[in-house]
Amino acid sequence: MGSQEDIPVGIIGASGYGGVQLTRLLLEHPHVHLAYLGGDSSAGRPFADLYPHLGFKQDLKVEAIDLDKVVERTQVVFLALPNGLAAEMAPTLVECGCKVLDLSADYRFTNLDTYEDWYGTKRQDRDLASTAVYGLPELYRQGISTASLVGCPGCFPTASLLALAPLLKQGLIDPNSAIIDAKTGTSGGGRQAKTHLLLAEANGSIGPYGVAHHRHTPEIEQVSSDLAGREVVVQFTPHLAPMTRGILATVYATMRDPGLVREDLITIFSAFYRNSPWVKVLPGSTYPFTKWAYGTNLCYLGIEVDQRTGRVIVISAIDNLMKGQAGQAVQCLNLMMGWPETMGLPELTFYP
C-alpha cells in the first residue's frame, strides 16, 4: 500500500496548457498538495491572473525557477517545459531526492543519439537519462512504480502505441507495414501565438504537417521495436484538425494471419488491456470519436479487419492534454507513489 499522507508537489512550467491541466488535476487529487508553481516568463504573477477560473481553488503565485526552493518544498516535481530544458534541471532534482516526471521529450529515449539527431540538442546527462522509465503505464507499469525519473510520452505516441501494442507484442502484423494517420486539436501547439493556430486559419480546415519528419516518429519506433523484439519503422503523418483538443489516430497494418476476424482481435485486445483501467476496447463495429475522451484520461480503441486487403485497422481516441499529457503524468505519479492509478483522474466526459 502507498502512503496516504499528502505529498508536496511542484510544477515547473505551470503557465502553459500542460501546466494548467496538471494544476487542475493536482488541486483535486486527494493525496497531494501544490507547494510550488514555477515559470520564468510569468514569474511574480498570481496564477489566477493567468487562469482566473482556478482562482477560487488556490492563491499561489508563479515563481522564478529556483531549484533550491523546489527541492526544499517538494517531493515530486513535474517538468512541463519546452524540449531541452528538463535535461538542465532533472539531474539536480533527482540527486536531491525528488521524484521527477518530465512532460517534454528529454527523457523518452533509450538512445540519446536518436534524441540529438531529431531534436538538435547535445546532452550532458547520459548517465541519468539511462535510468529514466518511459511513462506509458499500460506497457511499463512495473518500471514506473519504482522509478525516480519518468519520461512521459508524447500525445501522438500514446494514441498510436496503445493501438499498436497488442499487434506487435503478439506478432500479429508485419511490423514494418504500420501506417499511422493522426489528427490533433490546436491545443497541441501550445499557448503561444502562432499564425496557423489562429481561429481564422484553423477553423473549417484540416491539413498535414511534419510529413515524413515529425519528431514523434522515432519515439513511436523505439517503443514499437521494444514490443516487437526487432527494429520497426513506421509511416506517421499528423494533421491539424479544427478542434481545441483531442487526438484520433487511425493505424493500418498488414496481418500475418489473414484468417483472423474482428472478433478475434477484440478478444486479443481485451485480454491485453484487462488490467488497464484507462483503455476501453470497443465492441463490434463501434469506432471512437474524440469527444468521448474529452477531459478524461481514457483511450478508446475501435478495431476492424479488412479481409479484402488483409489489413487490420485500429482507431484510437484520446484527449491530447489528458491521456496525451497531464492526465497520463498523474497516472504515472499514482504508480510511483503506490496509489491506485485511477486516483484523482476524471473518467467521464462532458457531453455533448
From Swiss-Prot:
Write out the catalysed reaction. N-acetyl-L-glutamate 5-semialdehyde + phosphate + NADP(+) = N-acetyl-L-glutamyl 5-phosphate + NADPH + H(+)
Which molecular function terms from Gene Ontology are attached? N-acetyl-gamma-glutamyl-phosphate reductase activity; NAD binding; NADP+ binding
What EC number(s) does the entry state? 1.2.1.38
Primary location: cytoplasm
Give the annotated active site. Answer: 155
Q: Where in the cell is it found?
A: Cytoplasm
Q: Family membership, please give it.
A: Belongs to the NAGSA dehydrogenase family. Type 1 subfamily.
Against NCBIfam families, the record matches this protein to: argC
The protein, known as: N-acetyl-gamma-glutamyl-phosphate reductase
The species this protein belongs to is Acaryochloris marina (strain MBIC 11017)
The record's gene field reads: argC
